[in-house]
């Protein structure tokens, strides 16, 4: 399961190539910071076509010292959430629901896969997502 998860994660990294850089100010990122009370985890969201079963998009919710969403090459935005190069900050449960609702429709399903990880692993994945850039 871990190999499959990390293989999918590697696909996310590669799919971000070519996006335009976005860099929210430090104050906006600090203000939006959200720490989820649940266990440290990483959740892969895969958007699948209901017609063919093929993958159309993927995003990674990282719940570590804070909760962020890595959404490479995505079009999802929220005016109250700052973004830095495909990393969205301030991901509350309501924003997770909004993200899923944005992608799910009659022609697309959203599949969620979560694994619990140590705080160190969650923060390492988060640091790599933040460092990756658009």
Give short role names for the model-derived ranges.
Residues 2-7:
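Sec-dependent signal peptide recognition
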Residues 19, 23-24, 35-111:
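Glycine-rich catalytic cores of cysteine/serine-nucleophile enzymes that process amide/ester linkages
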Residues 100-134:
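Active-site nucleophile-His-acid catalytic modules used for acyl/amide transfer and hydrolysis
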Residues 15-16:
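C-terminal motif of bacterial Sec signal peptides marking the signal peptidase cleavage site
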Residues 26-29:
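Alpha-helical transmembrane signal-anchor/signal-peptide segments
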